[in-house]
Amino acid sequence: MDHDKTGCQSPPEGPKLCTNNCGFFGSAATMNMCSKCHKDMLFQQEQGAKFASAVSGTSSSSNIIKETFTAALVDIETKSVEPMTVSVQPSSVQVVAEVVAPEEAAKPKGPSRCTTCNKRVGLTGFKCRCGSLFCGTHRYADVHDCSFNYHAAAQEAIAKANPVVKAEKLDKI
């Protein structure tokens, strides 16, 4: 009697993880799979059954079609491999090197520094219209003696935005 009470009983069944190791719990009704994995498995079985019923046939013509189809697939695979080989010519390599070289020259190599005081500015630098980079102290045109003519640029912008309209001269009667 003591033998029946001690360790002969199986432990109570708790939740089991999905058999596909997706991290969710499965149930016995869904073959120890979670609901998503079970739906996916049923969908794959349906698709396999549809494909098998569409491909299989009782006539011998379906077998001929299968053989022709597989032969065509083999031909397509072998043909698709041949055009994929590409020969590299030295002239094309030089063109690529020429294209890459200007991009590398455009990027500044060292840290960005203020033109006036040579202080490191990094991302907080201010680029002036004269083309130089300045720190927060020297960013104003009057502080760094900017060579850009703001007055002339403003006059040109106004002239473009507001063209002068002249009426034709009227003839006197």
Swiss-Prot record:
Record key words, sorted: Metal-binding, Zinc, Zinc-finger
Recorded superkingdom: Eukaryota
Positions of Zn(2+) 2 binding: C114, C117, C135, H138
InterPro entries reported for this sequence: AN1-like_Znf, AN1_A20_ZnFinger, Znf_A20, Znf_AN1
Binding positions for Zn(2+) 3 per the UniProt entry: C128, C130, H144, C146
Keyword Nucleus: no
PROSITE patterns linked: ZF_A20, ZF_AN1
Coiled-coil residues: none
An MF annotation (GO) of this entry: DNA binding
Record: residues binding Zn(2+) 1: C18, C22, C34, C37
Keyword Metal-binding: yes
Zinc finger (A20-type): 12-46
Zinc finger (AN1-type): 108-154
Gene3D superfamilies, alphabetized: 1.20.5.4770, AN1-like Zinc finger
Pfam families: zf-A20, zf-AN1
Described function: May be involved in environmental stress response.
Full protein name: Zinc finger A20 and AN1 domain-containing stress-associated protein 2
Organism encoding this protein: Arabidopsis thaliana
Gene that encodes it: SAP2
